[in-house]
Regions:
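Short beta-strand segments of immunoglobulin-like
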Residues: 1-2, 96-102
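Beta-strand-rich binding/interaction modules
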Residues: 6-27, 55-62, 105-127
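Short strand-edge motifs at loop-to-beta-strand transitions and within beta-strands
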Residues: 7, 40-46
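Short acidic loop-to-helix transition motifs that present clustered carboxylates
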Residues: 26-30, 39-42, 90
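Acidic glycine/proline-rich low-complexity segments
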Residues: 28-33, 51-84, 117-154
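Outer-membrane beta-barrel proteins
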Residues: 34, 46-48, 71, 98-100
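Short gly/acidic/polar-rich coil/turn motifs that serve as flexible hinges in modular proteins
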Residues: 38-40, 49-52, 101, 105
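Proline-enriched interdomain boundary motifs that mark the N-terminal boundary
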Residues: 90-96
Length: 154
């Protein structure tokens, strides 16, 4: 899902039950809903927000009416579903304005900017390409590192 999109959730349940749906990140409860369930499937939706990126977990607790005899399911059932949420506002596109080649001992001028003008912090490292080739080093994608899936922690 992308920030701003509707997230549609379908919960199987019994009539006259309740579902407590908690939207959780790795460190906090972002939102929660108490839903009246219908026989069969119950659907509801909510909007994906920026604080749900890079992922959230839907922690669903389904509670049936006490002393019901319609089915033999437990009174309480639990389930957790992970959801990925993409926030395009977190993607940075740094640009370098510099000479095509650098020579040892020579002065160099490098201008660093972000394509969309977003604020960013950066570290600049100048490394010999031959050294990187010897070690088969592949330059990592920082966004994939900092916005990888978080473990549930609530």
């Amino acid at each position: 899902y992308q920030v701003g999109e509707n997230i549609e959730v379908t919960i199987p349940g019994s009539s006259q039950g309740k579902a407590l749906v908690s939207v959780e990140t790795g460190s906090q409860v972002v939102d929660n809903f108490l839903i009246q369930t219908n026989k069969g499937n119950t659907s509801f939706s909510f909007k994906a927000t920026a604080d749900m990126a890079p992922n959230v977990y839907l922690n669903i607790t389904l509670i049936q009416p006490h002393a019901q005899t319609v089915n033999d399911l437990p009174i309480r059932m639990y389930g957790i579903v992970p959801l990925k949420v993409y926030d395009p506002g977190t993607v940075l596109s740094p640009q370098l304005d510099m000479a095509g080649e650098l020579a040892p001992g020579k002065e160099v001028s490098i201008k660093v900017s972000e394509k969309e003008g977003k604020a960013m912090a950066y570290t600049l490292a100048i490394v010999d390409e031959g050294l990187l080739d010897i070690t088969n080093f592949e330059t990592p994608d920082p966004w994939n590192h900092f916005y990888k899936r978080e473990a549930i922690g609530v």
